[in-house]
């Protein structure tokens, strides 16, 4: 019996591994399942816990980020990154998949990255908006179009999950995978 959801997840993980290997993380590989002490889907990215989700049936960022955070602690990683394959973006567009972090961790990581590379990295922050798949895709697509960002800028959208209106540390920060990789590399992760 073929397990289609598992096959889709495996395919998404493999696409992320290929992208990471081509962009400064040559030791990235799919991690075998470890049950209750799961440490994320991708290993070989020292200091990072990377969880990958195939989201054709909708975004479940809250539960997925909770899972990513638990796996981050299990793996003793510095940061947890949730990579989401959205509907309509196949393996050839892995660079445009969503990379999501909790606001508190993103603030720490981005401060580190900007401190390491102040002349070559700036983060363009999107206005906080409520969590909505259509809005997210439209803002990311529009924000990364040619002419919207300087070569040294990264776009980080801000999504407010329900009940977090006054707590920016709990907001979700959403980038494309290509922008997240540039951010973590600027913060000192991956090969130099």
At which residue positions do the language-model features occur?
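Catalytic phosphate/metal-binding cores of nucleic-acid and nucleotide-processing enzymes, i.e., regions
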Residues: 1-192
